A protein has these predicted regions:
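C-terminal accessory/regulatory regions appended to core domains
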Residues: 1-205
């Protein structure tokens, strides 16, 4: 792959990463609030219907935990790859810290300074969690020059984008997410009935 083509593909993947990361964060937020409503509403409906939990009825093998989506899985890297990623992440974090340092923000408005401070906090959190892809997004937002792309960078970005995309799609297929999109109580109760059947809730005898 030519250097020009590699650079353009890298830029494309970074843009996709920024969108997917924002979309993933949005889905996590929506899922988190919807899960609480789902659990409370289902428990109320279950009691009204006189259903026992699988554990109470001892009608299934084992106990089925509450439905949860699988979080983004960390890419399995060999030691050399990990070291290279950590080196790039460290460089990016230092550049972000420099760009968001209070001494560099004196010419900005109070609102802009607050935004930069929040970006630094997010970058520090991402750095401690080894979430290099979030550092990449923050660096892009700050117009910080990114590392010269390599084929390895392309592969890592493609893998991370795929993981984010798969996680988002999985969340959208969960009962919690579908419940949150239901237009009325009747459709929600139909969903509860299906959920109860799949998980193994049974009527009181």
């Amino acid at each position: 792959m030519s250097a020009v083509r590699l650079k353009k593909k890298y830029e494309k993947l970074v843009l996709e990463l920024r969108y997917l990361t924002a979309d993933y964060d949005y889905h996590r937020l929506v899922y988190g609030t919807a899960q609480k409503r789902f659990e409370e509403s289902f428990e109320h409906w279950r009691i009204e219907q006189g259903l026992l939990t699988p554990a109470e009825a001892r009608a299934v093998q084992g106990v089925v935990p509450k439905e949860e989506f699988t979080d983004v899985v960390t890419i399995e890297e060999d030691e050399n790859t990990k070291k290279r990623i950590e080196k790039v992440a460290t460089i990016l974090f230092k550049k972000i810290a420099k760009a968001t340092h209070p001494d560099k923000l004196l010419h900005l408005s109070e609102e802009e300074r607050a935004t930069r401070l929040q970006m630094f906090i997010e970058a520090r959190k991402a750095s401690s969690r080894r979430e290099w892809y979030r550092l990449l997004c923050i660096a892009t937002d700050l117009a910080i020059s990114l590392p010269i792309p390599t084929k390895e960078h392309i592969t890592l970005l493609e893998s991370k984008n795929s993981e984010l995309r798969d996680t988002i799609q999985y969340m959208e297929k969960t009962y919690v997410w579908v419940y949150d999109q239901m237009p009325n109580e009747e459709s929600k109760h139909r969903l509860f009935k299906e959920f109860a059947s799949v998980i193994g809730y049974v009527p009181v005898k």
